[in-house]
């Protein structure tokens, strides 16, 4: 049975939801697009909780009616058996709903609704690592496209064999960060490289960083801390390619973070894109510091988001992907084709379970 504290929390959520519903109908709000969007988003984030609470309330009414029927059917064995069976099903459903409600009330990550910059860097393994980084970029692009998200290449440094030394994807859509934040870490591949003449299996790595997009208000950058150089671009630019210096090489002196942007058509656009990436990187550093202080008090298997954490091994010979946090295997090819939902949902489930254990 749900605790009084849980029920009070749910009533508060319901009251807030109703208040936001009223505000959405306010003509003054309708004339302010930014405020309208903010309220609609806040209301939408509570909708699943309120619906589950209403389902739970209806279930409790059904339980009371079935218990009353059971008491009244003592003289009718057949009716009594039916009432007992229904009561058992309702109680099982009640337990499931209460678990769902508890999860829905867990503290939300304020970044969950944000778009992201997803950075993939080749690690150990030379050109094979760069090829692997390119494979990961394709995997995430396919996953994003399946969910109807938009993906564009924000920055790219290519390897000699066509792989990626470093790639940054800008991914926009519904709750992008909430799903992809558990992808941060070291992705290891075991396969025979295209450069291997003897057919031996090599191990290479690529590192994934997931950075929520932030605006200028959230991360303030002192212009004196920025050093910008320009260069001729080999990227998009039509007849301007290699004639006009459209590429931007940006250095943030306090941290040593360097961002090189060539993908836009003008120097101004590349400069704006480089600053956007820098803000995301600085914000991610801040999140890492916060996470490190939390992790010193508790050790969770998922959710640390550390760049150095080995999270997954992709084994081509055995046609399997092993997620080391879940201690679980998945078929390789569907994962590479962007079918990541089962894996990501398993990570979210484990994170929620660990968070529940911590809060209790």
Curated annotation (Swiss-Prot):
Keywords: Cytoplasm, Methylation, Protein biosynthesis
PTM summary: Methylated by PrmC. Methylation increases the termination efficiency of RF1.
UniProt record similarity statement: Belongs to the prokaryotic/mitochondrial release factor family.
MF annotations from Gene Ontology: translation release factor activity, codon specific
Places the protein is found: Cytoplasm
Species whose genome carries this gene: Synechococcus sp. (strain JA-2-3B'a(2-13))
Entry keyword Oxidoreductase: no
Cellular component per GO, a single term: cytoplasm
Its biological purpose: Peptide chain release factor 1 directs the termination of translation in response to the peptide chain termination codons UAG and UAA.
Modified residues (N5-methylglutamine): 239
Gene name of this polypeptide: prfA
PANTHER family: LD18447P (PTHR43804), PEPTIDE CHAIN RELEASE FACTOR APG3, CHLOROPLASTIC (PTHR43804:SF8)
HAMAP family: Rel_fac_1
Designated name of the protein: Peptide chain release factor 1
